[in-house]
């Protein structure tokens, strides 16, 4: 709930290990609220959320992050006055395996985002929108997550940059990470995901394999321009 308004109601979502699951729907449908609930930024008033069998809906966000869930928020939310490397290291703040942080920086983050390696000493606020999106994703990966929550990663990006971000999401998934993707660009989301949920005004109205939803007449009409 936000104040007395129910943002989502009776939502039941299952995310299989190693899959990309997408939530699509119009603005205000409840997609971001769902991600915020999973990450601990918003606590549900009823129901429960489980991760790897453990109930997490009462936990604070830093404990949820420590369990292996990282969120890339809508709008990137990088720290503009801090350098690229400083932003990335904030993602590793809660890690106990300090010896592996430098290794992950080189073998995970800079492998997926070589552009960030060229800009480690640059202030994050001077990066382009696409580079800031890469930085936000890299920061999340520095927490070594099992589950990556992506909120509108293509928002405000050029078509070319959208394609690059999509390719990076595929590569991250190919390494075995589970991804939940919230995306208004339904065409992109359904191309990336294996399973999809359509949310409207806080309710799930459709769900199924992404390839089936791509061919669904209602989905085509409402979200795919035809």
Regions found by a protein language model. Give the residues of each.
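Helix-to-loop junction immediately C-terminal to a conserved catalytic motif
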Residues: 39
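Conserved ABC transporter NBD signature motif
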Residues: 47-55, 67, 100-106, 111
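ABC ATPase C-loop
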Residues: 140-141
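Conserved catalytic motifs of ABC-family nucleotide-binding domains
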Residues: 144
């Amino acid at each position: 709930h936000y104040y007395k308004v129910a943002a989502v109601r009776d939502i039941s979502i299952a995310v299989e290990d190693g899959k990309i699951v997408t939530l699509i729907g119009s603005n205000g449908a409840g997609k971001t609220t769902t991600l915020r609930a999973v990450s601990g930024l918003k606590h549900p008033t009823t129901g429960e959320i489980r991760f790897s069998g453990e109930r997490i809906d009462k936990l604070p966000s830093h404990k949820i992050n420590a369990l292996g869930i990282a969120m890339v928020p809508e709008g990137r939310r990088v720290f503009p006055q801090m350098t690229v490397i400083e932003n990335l290291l904030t993602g590793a703040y809660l890690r106990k395996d300090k010896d592996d942080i430098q290794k992950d920086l080189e073998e995970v983050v800079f492998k997926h985002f070589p552009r960030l390696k060229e800009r480690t000493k640059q202030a994050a606020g001077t990066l382009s929108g696409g580079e800031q999106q890469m930085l936000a994703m890299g920061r999340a990966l520095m927490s070594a997550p099992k589950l990556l929550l992506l909120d509108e990663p293509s928002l405000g990006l050029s078509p070319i940059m959208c394609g690059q971000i999509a390719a990076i999401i595929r590569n991250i998934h190919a390494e075995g990470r589970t991804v939940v993707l919230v995306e208004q660009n339904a065409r992109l989301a359904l191309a990336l995901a294996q399973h999809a949920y359509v949310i409207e005004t806080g309710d799930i109205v459709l769900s199924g394999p992404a390839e089936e939803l791509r061919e669904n007449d209602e989905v085509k009409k409402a979200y795919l321009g035809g």
